[in-house]
Amino acid sequence: MTAAAAATAPNEVTEMATETTALSPRFYTTDVKAMNELSVEAVRAEWDKLMAEFAADKNFGHFKRTDDWAFDPNDLPEDLRKELTDFMVSSLTAEFSGCVLYAELHKKGFDPDMKTLFKFLARDESRHAGFINECLRDFGVQVDMGFLVREKKYTHFSPKFILYATYLSEKIGYARYIRIYRHLEQNPDHQFHPIFQKFFRWCNDEFRHGEALALILRANPKLLRGHNRMWIRFFQLAVFTTMYVRDHTRPAFHRALGIDPEEYGMDVFRITAEISKQVFPDILDVDNPKFLAGLRKIHELALRIDASKKKGFFGKLRAIPLQLGVGVRFLKLLFLPTQANALPEEIRVAPAW
């Protein structure tokens, strides 16, 4: 590598954020015109009230390091330090993915309601990503977000897929953060990084984002009918499965928090499923014993795939039937009985967890 190339090469955490894998957060594009053709008139009163909440910007100034901020990464064992960095980079990438998508929808949109919403969402996600990047400074690194915008691969989704995926992402983000926050309220000795102190107000941003996306979906009921019901089921399962497998790659992180990743995951799934009753006509039955059994099997196969891929060309060949096995297990989970849900007249729910 030449000196000039070395000077412009991304650092390690930027490379981590740029990677596209089955478990890593992705960057998305969509059909801006089709998104702006959706209407919120059917939920106008609730929409205007929610936009006023966004405009009030109650979390302005929250995402800053306070005077009592105290953290030294050298105080952590190496495995925990590595997994905390991975958690932060993954979280930053997910937040920044939303920022990039929402900013594009605001910039290129033409419907006033959509432009207003996506301006607020991009504002919040930018703050979240920027704050995590500030936290990474303690490790002597930061993600080059400009490089990320240019170099990370983008996945194109139709507007309805964007709405299903981002709604679930925002709501499961709320559930993840509030579950950790409530746990640390009761177990403060496990709070090994000050970022967790921010999670209560942070997760309410995520919840509010999900409320806006729920209103769009409910205002356009065709997105919740017919074959779309199977897509909704698919996205629920994809989000839950990805979280379950990814969280099990951070044993030291969860051990330091005093949280069992499986128990934590199931709690998060239950919260997310309960919230999702505001908008989805079919809810995954996460308490069906076959659901957890299927997740465990997919995790087991994922471990075997990872081990095989590290053994060169023939290892990658041996991974192929294992990958097919993951697909089979996923399909079995997809066709488990779901809970039929009559959509409530009052759409919005309160972040009461």
Per-segment meaning from a language model:
Residues 2-353:
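Non-heme di-metal
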